[in-house]
Swiss-Prot record:
Subcellular location: Cell inner membrane
Stored InterPro entries: GlcNAc_MurG, Glyco_trans_28_C, GlycoTrans_28_N
UniProt-recorded name of the protein: UDP-N-acetylglucosamine--N-acetylmuramyl-(pentapeptide) pyrophosphoryl-undecaprenol N-acetylglucosamine transferase
Record function comment: Cell wall formation. Catalyzes the transfer of a GlcNAc subunit on undecaprenyl-pyrophosphoryl-MurNAc-pentapeptide (lipid intermediate I) to form undecaprenyl-pyrophosphoryl-MurNAc-(pentapeptide)GlcNAc (lipid intermediate II).
Name of the encoding gene: murG
GO biological process: carbohydrate metabolic process; cell division; cell wall organization; lipid glycosylation; peptidoglycan biosynthetic process; regulation of cell shape
Species this chain originates from: Wolinella succinogenes (strain ATCC 29543 / DSM 1740 / CCUG 13145 / JCM 31913 / LMG 7466 / NCTC 11488 / FDC 602W)
Reaction catalyzed: di-trans,octa-cis-undecaprenyl diphospho-N-acetyl-alpha-D-muramoyl-L-alanyl-D-glutamyl-meso-2,6-diaminopimeloyl-D-alanyl-D-alanine + UDP-N-acetyl-alpha-D-glucosamine = di-trans,octa-cis-undecaprenyl diphospho-[N-acetyl-alpha-D-glucosaminyl-(1->4)]-N-acetyl-alpha-D-muramoyl-L-alanyl-D-glutamyl-meso-2,6-diaminopimeloyl-D-alanyl-D-alanine + UDP + H(+)
GO MF annotations, alphabetized: UDP-N-acetyl-D-glucosamine:N-acetylmuramoyl-L-alanyl-D-glutamyl-meso-2,6-diaminopimelyl-D-alanyl-D-alanine-diphosphoundecaprenol 4-beta-N-acetylglucosaminlytransferase activity; undecaprenyldiphospho-muramoylpentapeptide beta-N-acetylglucosaminyltransferase activity
Stored HAMAP family: MurG
A single Gene Ontology CC term: plasma membrane
Chief location bin: membrane
Keywords: Cell cycle, Cell division, Cell inner membrane, Cell membrane, Cell shape, Cell wall biogenesis/degradation, Glycosyltransferase, Membrane, Peptidoglycan synthesis, Transferase
SUPFAM superfamilies, per the entry: UDP-Glycosyltransferase/glycogen phosphorylase (SSF53756)
């Protein structure tokens, strides 16, 4: 069957697309992808052999635009939708699966206009505008936060489960700023570094490409040993080494940490659309599976309290809560 995956913009959306691609490819399906020329879509999938064809259309986000910029964004989305219609027809696509993000709009709307079944995965606890609009017209709407969802497990790649382990005491901390880094987390890491080092705890830090040189100087000036990196696609290998993560609350990071059994202190990005990272972290907090602090409330005391805890119960509960095989269950559902 010819199936098209669409969506992206950020690593969170694209991680879901990759997990679904791997599962559907293992079931001998012919896969196609439509993303955007902007964002990270091209860097993730331009050379991805799991897709038979990959298309990157000229689109940009609409939600945060105003005035003329919003009109231009809507116009680019409409033109891209017309291109997507041609792609779907030319390649006889039978299913379209959206993983969200502004780059999902053209192919999703094209699918509905052509009567092709549309499946939507919502990665966040707070439903995005596009998915909210398309949900009533979709064949199925899947969400890990929705009690009415037919599949509630989050599609995390097997690699994160394969290196999972139970943590107890903190010997190494991993700072995670998401696929693009986070200046607030970077700054807090430098503030905490002397205290962490004094306690004999090792530091790993994913700081993003833009802030890499500044962070490198910052650790050197403090004479703090650190494993510093801008970004790593094999982030599961970094997680496996850590005992505690300090992270943004993007959905994929949140569930990947859970699959790995790695307890985390979440610092939601305060300017995320609809404050969705706060609601993502709150969902985990409400299950008793992690910690959360608002960016404006960061303090040394927050970390000190966690360092005194035995993490084994949270770690074990995370591993039990996040189920393996969600991508396969979603793939089977889409093919049924």
């Amino acid at each position: 069957m010819n199936i098209l995956l669409t969506g992206g913009g950020t690593g969170g959306h694209l991680a879901i697309a990759k997990a679904l691609m791997e599962s559907l490819a293992s079931k001998n399906q012919s896969l196609f992808f439509i993303g955007s020329q902007r964002g990270q879509d091209r860097s993730w999938f331009e050379h991805e052999e799991g897709f038979k064809r990959r298309f990157f259309l000229e689109t940009q986000g609409v939600v945060n635009q105003r005035g003329i910029a919003k009109i231009r964004s809507l116009s680019s989305q409409f033109q891209a939708m017309l291109e997507a219609r041609k792609i779907l027809k030319n390649h006889q696509i039978k299913r379209v699966v959206s993983v969200g993000g502004y780059s999902a709009a053209p192919a999703s709307l094209a699918a509905l206009s052509l009567g092709i079944p549309l499946y939507i995965h919502e990665q966040n606890a707070k439903v995005g505008l596009l998915n909210r609009l398309l949900k009533p017209f979709s064949r199925a709407f899947l969400s890990s936060y929705d009690s009415n969802s037919l599949i509630r497990d989050y599609p995390v790649r097997d690699a994160f489960f394969e290196v999972a382990r139970v943590r107890s005491r903190v010997k190494k901390i991993l700072f995670l700023g998401g696929s693009q880094g986070a200046k607030a987390i970077n700054d807090w890491a430098l503030e905490l570094a002397p205290l962490i080092h004094q306690r004999g705890i090792a530091i790993m830090h994913q700081c993003g490409e833009v802030d890499y040189e500044r962070m490198k100087r910052g650790y050197e000036e403090r004479s703090i040993p650190v494993e510093l990196f801008a970004f790593d696609r094999a982030i599961h290998q970094k997680m496996q080494q850590a005992d505690l993560a300090i992270s943004r609350a993007g959905a994929s990071s949140l569930w990947e940490l859970g699959a790995n059994g790695l307890p985390a202190l979440f610092i939601p990005y305060p300017f995320a659309a609809g404050d969705h990272q706060y609601y993502n972290a709150k969902f985990i907090l409400d299950q008793g599976l992690g910690w959360m602090v608002r960016q404006e409330n960061l303090s040394t005391e927050v970390l000190l309290e966690i360092l005194e805890e035995d993490l084994s119960q949270k770690s074990e509960c995370l591993m039990a809560y996040v189920k393996r095989g969600a991508a396969d269950r979603m793939a089977d559902f889409i093919l049924s």
